[in-house]
Curated annotation (Swiss-Prot):
Disulfide bridges in this chain: none
Phylogenetic classification of the source organism: Bacteria, Bacillati, Bacillota, Bacilli, Bacillales
Protein name as annotated: Large ribosomal subunit protein uL1
GO MF: rRNA binding; structural constituent of ribosome; tRNA binding
Keyword Repressor: yes
Keywords for this protein: Repressor, Ribonucleoprotein, Ribosomal protein, RNA-binding, rRNA-binding, Translation regulation, tRNA-binding
A Pfam family of this chain: Ribosomal_L1
Family annotation (InterPro entries): Ribosom_uL1_bac-type, Ribosomal_uL1, Ribosomal_uL1-like, Ribosomal_uL1/biogenesis, Ribosomal_uL1_3-a/b-sand, Ribosomal_uL1_CS
GO terms for cellular component: large ribosomal subunit
Organism the protein comes from: Bacillus cytotoxicus (strain DSM 22905 / CIP 110041 / 391-98 / NVH 391-98)
């Protein structure tokens, strides 16, 4: 296990590991225990009672956080003709087709989110091996394969985040920055919790939201009382 720095150790002493704090208390603690000198990201982690190996217990989607994440997302849109013009008008950072496919194949990745119109997916599909492992492949479930490119770009720029359960049943989602007001972090936190509760698979048995923690980039994790999120 990696050795923790002195600042981290001191910060961790402020957190009672056996205690599940209210969402508001947890956010306050995360800000108090942040040791980074930069505006650290605040991330929520949900351990869910699902079996991701089963197709009917996969959880994946996207949600627009009311106060965004504090990160400016660079959006690449694969589209042609009028749809390309709409994407540019909506504020997409990069818009094109074959030219950007070639750039990516040559190692260009100066973007954070990829959107594609359905008619472009035949070409974009060639990038599956490159974009897939990075979590950048457009997908209808997250609203990134669509003809409504204006809505897609607007939502991403407004603070849309994608979520996907991993092999261990966990979901990690950024909910803002330590510079955010407490109330805004809590509202973002509750928004993603509510979204995940609504996404509960019918086949999931037992306790669904088993454990929730919140942490800053370089700070200790803080357990959260699930009942304060709903």
């Amino acid at each position: 296990m990696a050795k923790r720095g002195k600042k981290y150790v001191e910060a961790a002493k402020l957190v009672e590991r056996a205690t599940a704090y209210s969402a508001t208390e947890a956010v306050e603690l995360v800000k108090k225990t942040n040791t980074a000198k930069f505006d650290a990201t605040v991330e929520a982690a949900f351990r869910l009672g699902v079996d991701p190996k089963k197709a009917d217990q996969q959880i994946r989607g996207a949600v627009v956080l009311p106060h965004g994440t504090g990160k400016v997302q660079r959006v690449l849109v694969f589209a042609k003709g009028e749809k390309a013009k709409e994407a540019e008008a909506a504020g997409a950072d990069f818009v094109g087709d074959a030219d950007y496919i070639n750039k990516i194949q040559q190692g260009w990745f100066d973007f954070d989110v990829v959107v594609a119109t359905p008619d472009m997916m035949g070409e974009v599909g060639k990038l599956g091996r490159v974009l897939g492992p990075k979590g950048l492949m457009p997908n209808p479930k997250t609203g990134t394969v669509t003809f409504d490119v204006t809505k897609a770009v607007n939502e991403i720029k407004a603070g849309k985040v994608e979520y996907r359960v991993d092999k261990a049943g966990n979901i990690h989602v950024p909910i803002g920055k330590v510079s955010f007001e407490d109330a805004k972090l809590v509202e973002n936190f509750k928004t993603i919790a509510d979204t995940l509760l609504k996404a509960k698979p019918a086949a999931a048995k037992g306790t669904y939201m088993k454990n929730v923690t919140v942490t800053s980039t370089m700070g200790p994790g803080v357990r959260v009382d699930v009942s304060t999120l709903v």
